[in-house]
Structures are given as C-alpha cells and as structure tokens.
Curated annotation (Swiss-Prot):
PROSITE patterns: GLYCOSYL_HYDROL_F17. GO terms for molecular function: glucan endo-1,3-beta-D-glucosidase activity. Keywords: Glycoprotein, Glycosidase, Hydrolase, Plant defense, Pyrrolidone carboxylic acid, Signal, Vacuole. It catalyses: Hydrolysis of (1->3)-beta-D-glucosidic linkages in (1->3)-beta-D-glucans. Residues 1-25 form the signal peptide. Glycans are attached at residue 350. Induction: Upon infection by virulent and avirulent races of pathogens, for example fungal pathogen C.fulvum. GO terms for cellular component: vacuole. This is Glucan endo-1,3-beta-glucosidase B. SUPFAM superfamilies: (Trans)glycosidases (SSF51445). GO terms for biological process: carbohydrate metabolic process; defense response.
Amino acid sequence: MATSQIAIIVLLGLLVATNIHITEAQIGVCYGMMGNNLPSHSEVIQLYKSRNIRRLRLYDPNHGALNALRGSNIEVILGLPNVDVKHISSGMEHARWWVQKNVRDFWPHVKIKYIAVGNEISPVTGTSNLAPFQVPALVNIYKAIGEAGLGNDIKVSTSVDMTLIGNSYPPSQGSFRNDVRWFTDPIVGFLRDTRAPLLVNIYPYFSYSGNPGQISLPYALFTAPNVVVQDGSRQYRNLFDAMLDSVYAAMDRTGGGSVGIVVSESGWPSAGAFGATHENAQTYLRNLIQHAKEGSPRKPGPIETYIFAMFDENNKNPELEKHFGMFSPNKQPKYNLNFGVSERVWDITNSTASSLTSEI
C-alpha cells in the first residue's frame, strides 16, 4: 500500500476519533421561556442546530417546543414541573396520562433522554411542601415509562441544587445535610436501583458572590494558575470540580457510589449583581465548555453538562436572573463560544472522507 494511502487511512481514523470525542463531551443548553420577547419555538430549535448544540433541557412539556424538536436529533431532558409533582405522586393513572401525552406521543421523533421529575425540590427551601411527594412521583413516572415500553431508552431522575449538601469542604468529605437525609437517601437509592444519574445544578457564581472574601474569582472562573485545594492526592484548581466532587462523595456515603451525575444547570450572569459582568460570564462559559471534556479529579472523563441558559429572560426575578442567556432575544450571541465542529464542517468532512475512501 502506498505511503500516501496509509496517511489517508490514518487521517480518517483521526477524524472519526475526533468526532466521537466531541460527541461524548457535547454541551447542552437549557431552553427557558420566561420572556415576552423570545423567538418562536421553530426558530429556537434552528438556532440550536446551527450552533451545533445537540442537547437541550426543557423545564416543562411545552408541546410547541416538542413539536419543533421532531426530527432534530437533539437529545432532551424533559421536565415534569414542580406544580405537577404532587398530582403525579397520587396515582399511576396520572403518571400514565402524563407519559402518554408528553412522552409517548412524541417518541421516537423527539429524542427524550431523561425525565426530570421536579426541579430543586428541597425540604429546606420554599419547595419543602413538595418534598414528601418527590419519590412517589419518581416511582410512578418510572413505572409508566416502563409500561410504555421505553424503560431502556429514557431514564427518570430529578434535578437538585447544592442546598442539600451540608459539608462540601474538602470535596472528599462531602455529605448531605442530616436534616434532609430522609429525602435524599431514597432518591439516591432509587437512582442506584434504576441505573439513572442524579441531575445537579452547580453554580460557582453563587458560591463566589456569597463569599468573595473566602473564594477567589479565578477559582470560580477556571482561571486559577495554581492548585487552590489539596484534598489528599486530588488537586483542585476550580470551584466547579470541588462542588461536583462533594456531591459524588455525598452519594458515596449514602450507598450511591455507582450513581452518575449530569450537571443539569450551570452558568454565570452578565449583569444584575455582584460579579455579574459580560467578561466574567464569557470567561466562565468558555472554560466550562472546554472543561466538560475533562472531568473532575474524582471522576475523570466527559461530564454531560447543560448551560443555563439559551436566552436572557425578561420576566424572571430578581434582576440577575434576567441575564443568564447566551443569546439576546433577537438571537444575537452575547459571547464568542464554540460548541465544537459545526454540522456543516462535518458534512464536508464526511463527504471528503467518502471520496478519499473510494480512491484507496
């Protein structure tokens, strides 16, 4: 075989390997709709596709958005809103109806990957009244998904925040608060038994803005030049990893060492509060996208991560919540971000690879 032909084969192998790596580390983006000036659902999904964003989180089963997603090949976290959790927990008939109307009617044309039953429900926040219904709702939706024949395709989980963590420093000593163990232990057990990941919302911004005297901005933005936290043999240069690994440690302590984590939200506001600037937000998002390929000291490897959020949403409060978007409502990007090789480039690569192969 000629040297040039060998070189072409090696090149093709590298292209395939690169494509796989990009897919594994692909970042998703949360599609919030709390704005009165946002683009149509079809425009939004087209924007996802044009920017090579292949994963999306929906906070409720908006049928306009789900219809726009048909045939897009975008993977979806589909939210079951907090307002429906108690109702779903009360009987299988409600869970079956919800799954039929919001999942089965769209599958497989919409690639629903996870169902997030509730968002940030916690016994120690304003959602405490829903906490007793969380696990029954999870179980009912899980059973309904199984009855619909989708148990091997769609995982059922819930999205939590860091308020459930009692100790997070050092990360290896992470643990759930004692007063929420009645809530977290059954969730971790459910996820372990069903082999589903825990969805976790991780925001270094809020930790930094609440404790700027103890947490440095570079540590929060992935830009610290040196190790900030030495935890045994593990070294931490960024707060994101430390927060993530503290949750892994907490689950390990409750029998959930085999449970994976999906970072279901992470972002940085560009205005509206302390430390919320365009420069900081761009730095954080750029570095988060890159870091998702690498993993944490405790769990190396790609981290499935969803950026919050696609758009600035002017109906949210307080003020900083209006400024988490990567795009303005007119679809103009606020930052220069790269989500990997564009679909157009990969089309060119694939056609070139095909023609090269035919010549060997």
